[in-house]
């Protein structure tokens, strides 16, 4: 029997984490218990090991099985990969055995090229649909260039910012179909300028390059840092999940969100999460736009929200633990894209463990085993001196994304956070939004403050996992990253200015408040 490198979501279950990775095993498990999951397949962790053994190449056998997976997906979904009439577009996502937030890479909208884009638009005369297609295309070119070809995101962000400035608009959603079409052309030109070759138009070649990129990212510097800190063996490898795209950016009847079945900061038993209308999942997690609280989804999409509440209950009853979920609504229909046991602060871990015993989900012994002893010291998080806090006036407020109190000197890059901390300075890292590359600087800082992003953004999730104080989504900050300064409530802060942030309330103060 030849090796089986590929499993469809109907062939796996949650006991197969070692082979399918956490994400793949949970997608298969959600399929098995009847939840709405777009039907795709997983390339195993063993294929990742084989990729490294073959000198960082995907062998023909693995690729052939992946294409069989594509053919199965085409049958399940009634669309064809690379077809001009009814194209199947896919996402390619990593999924290791242990959850590694933001460490590994995702590519969305794969399968688009100039011909597919033109055919999709010709088949649907609605001008809003045209905008959606060009939006998906420019996102794909940007992600593929960044993740697969390692052309920095910043080149594309600069083109977007320039386009918005030229058009006099503030948000990406305000760009028109014509603007996005022009952006896609600019992105392809930038790709050629950086790499000297044309952007690949063959969907099969795109897929192969994307799978290789996920395997390669298992060995990238930030993944290695996270593995070292969390005792994850190098030999485990990562799986690759390929699934049909569902589009949260299709129209205003669509959206995307991230939610926790309980509050990951306090442990309170209430749904906590965030939602963006007319957006793709990356927008919520990457903190590109600051989203709205999940409860507002009830007004926008009552049927999908009611179904989502049922899904949350089903998942908690099934996994007997707090779940962290990603979902998309396409034309009012709910799709589940991921679930996993959610990362939580130490106080939340204690409360959730006790509550799960009271609710009959866990025995006391199981509840004790859920608590990571390394996290208990963060119960002694620094708190501001109560009298000093009372006397201080907050300059501004963001979201209290990870509890604790932090004060120190302002720095604007992860590298500066590291070098200042090595000199013994206490620093607060201030960013527009953090990305996985910032992990070493986030570790070095006393606290993290971001202008964009919500409670489920990269900064918030990683900070909670590390027990570091974080305030996210303070949109009142006027940021000038290039000149290393920001303005808040009329005060300008430069590199080395002193600042205090409260990760419980989200308040931001000038100067140092004693802890």
Q: Where on the chain are the PLM-derived regions?
A:
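Long, structured protein-protein interaction/assembly regions in large complexes
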Residues: 406, 410-416
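Short, hinge-like loop/turn segments at secondary-structure boundaries
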Residues: 56-58, 487-490
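Catalytic domains of riboflavin
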Residues: 365, 389-407
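Acidic, glycine-rich catalytic loops of TOPRIM or P-loop NTPase phosphate-binding modules used
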Residues: 467-479
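Nucleotide/phosphate-binding sheet-loop regions of phosphoryl- and nucleotidyl-transfer enzymes
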Residues: 1-392, 419, 425-428, 435-440, ...
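Surface-exposed strand-loop junctions at beta-sheet edges and helix termini
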Residues: 429, 449-450, 488
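Generic beta-sheet signal
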Residues: 451, 471-473, 501-502
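Internal insertion modules embedded within essential enzymes
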Residues: 482, 489-515
């Amino acid at each position: 029997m030849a090796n089986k490198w590929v499993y469809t979501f109907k062939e796996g279950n949650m006991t197969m984490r070692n082979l399918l990775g956490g994400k793949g095993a949970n997608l298969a498990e959600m399929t098995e218990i009847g939840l709405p999951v777009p039907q795709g397949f997983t390339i195993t962790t063993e294929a990742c090991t084989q990729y490294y053994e073959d000198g960082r190449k995907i062998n023909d056998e693995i690729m052939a099985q992946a294409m069989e997976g594509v053919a199965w997906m085409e049958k399940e979904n009634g669309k064809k990969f690379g077809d001009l009439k009814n194209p199947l577009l896919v996402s390619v996502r990593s999924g290791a055995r242990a959850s590694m937030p933001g460490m590994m890479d995702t590519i969305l909208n794969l399968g688009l090229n100039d011909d597919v884009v033109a055919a999709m638009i010709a088949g649907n005369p609605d001008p809003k649909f045209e905008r959606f297609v060009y939006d998906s295309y420019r996102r794909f070119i940007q992600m593929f260039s960044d993740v697969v070809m390692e052309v920095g995101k910043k080149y594309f962000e600069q083109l977007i910012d320039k386009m918005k400035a030229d058009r006099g608009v503030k948000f990406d959603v305000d760009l028109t179909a014509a603007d996005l079409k022009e952006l896609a052309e600019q992105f392809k030109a930038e790709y050629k300028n950086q790499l000297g070759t044309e952007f690949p138009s063959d969907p099969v070649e795109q897929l192969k390059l994307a799978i290789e990129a996920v395997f390669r990212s298992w060995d990238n510097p930030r993944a290695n840092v996270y593995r070292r800190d969390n005792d994850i063996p190098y030999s485990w490898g990562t799986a690759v999940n390929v699934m049909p795209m569902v589009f949260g950016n299709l129209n205003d009847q669509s959206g995307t969100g991230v939610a926790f079945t309980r509050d990951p900061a306090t442990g309170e038993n209430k749904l906590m999460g965030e939602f963006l209308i007319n957006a793709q999942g990356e927008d919520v997690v990457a903190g590109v736009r600051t989203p709205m609280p999940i409860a507002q989804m009830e007004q926008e999409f009552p049927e999908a929200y009611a179904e989502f509440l049922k899904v949350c209950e089903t998942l908690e009853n099934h996994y007997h633990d707090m779940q962290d979920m990603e979902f998309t609504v396409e034309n009012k229909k709910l799709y589940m894209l991921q679930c996993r046991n959610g990362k939580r602060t130490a106080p939340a871990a204690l409360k959730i463990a006790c509550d799960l015993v009271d609710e009959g989900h866990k025995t006391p012994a199981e509840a004790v085993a859920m608590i990571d002893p390394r996290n208990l010291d963060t119960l002694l998080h620094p708190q501001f001196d109560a009298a000093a806090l009372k006397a201080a006036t907050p300059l501004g407020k963001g979201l209290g994304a990870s509890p604790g109190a932090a004060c120190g000197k302002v720095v604007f890059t992860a590298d500066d956070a590291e070098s200042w901390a090595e000199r013994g300075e206490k620093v607060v890292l201030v960013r527009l939004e953090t990305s996985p590359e910032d992990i070493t600087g986030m570790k070095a800082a006393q606290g993290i403050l971001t202008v964009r992003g919500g409670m489920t953004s990269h900064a918030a999730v990683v900070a909670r996992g590390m027990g570091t104080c974080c305030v996210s989504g303070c949109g009142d900050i006027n940021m000038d990253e290039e000149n290393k300064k920001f303005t808040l409530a009329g005060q300008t802060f430069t590199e080395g200015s002193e600042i205090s942030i409260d990760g419980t309330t989200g308040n931001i103060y000038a100067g140092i408040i004693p802890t």
